[in-house]
A protein has these predicted regions:
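N-terminal domain-start signal
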Residues: 1-185
């Protein structure tokens, strides 16, 4: 009976949060809109993400800025669920965060492998990762090569699977992605 109450509360919390998500029909309607400002106007008019979009100014109507806001909302939702859970349920959520961590590492690998000149733009994720993750964004943004990136992951569980590829010839981004996915699953 205890598990029913414990998990029933979590399921109820998630269902309540789920009711505020976009439906497949909403996505179809959004796909028919022309331009980011039209999508934002539709989301505002239909009551989605008001706490995120209400403060958005016209100069921040760039897709990248909006993606950052929505990603932060995803992290905020994770935090709400995490705080609601007991210690046993938090163990699962700690495993679930690996998805966010591997996405972050993949992003950083793309930056260093493709030698992008633009600096890492990860400061908007910093608070979340500092609190819930073993990965230091401060260390990752200093990486300019794959070797540096892997070294900056030394104190994490991702160091071993990635460092195993380091001395092999012809390693590509796909190989690193595959190693992370295999480790995660």
């Amino acid at each position: 009976m205890g598990n029913l109450l414990t998990y029933g509360g979590i399921v109820t919390k998630i269902r309540a949060m789920e009711s505020k998500l976009l439906t497949p029909g909403d996505f179809e309607e959004i796909a028919g809109l022309h331009g980011v400002p039209a999508v934002i106007a539709w989301l505002r008019d239909n009551g989605f993400y008001p706490f995120v979009l209400d403060d958005l100014t016209d100069e921040h109507l760039h897709r990248g800025d909006i993606e950052k806001l929505l990603i932060n909302q995803l992290y905020y939702d994770y935090m709400k669920i995490f705080r609601f859970c007991g210690l046993e349920q938090r163990k699962f959520l700690t495993l679930y965060i690996m998805r966010y961590e591997t996405d972050l590492i993949d992003y950083c690998l793309r930056i260093v492998i493709n030698h992008y000149q633009e600096p890492f733009d990860l400061n908007y994720k910093k608070d979340f990762f500092d609190r819930y993750s073993q990965i230091s964004i401060e260390k990752l943004i200093t990486s300019r090569t794959t070797d540096q990136l892997i070294e900056n992951l030394k104190d994490t569980e991702y160091y071993k699977p990635l460092s195993a590829l380091r001395d092999k010839a012809g390693i590509t981004l796909f190989d690193y992605d595959l190693a992370l996915d295999q480790y995660r699953f």
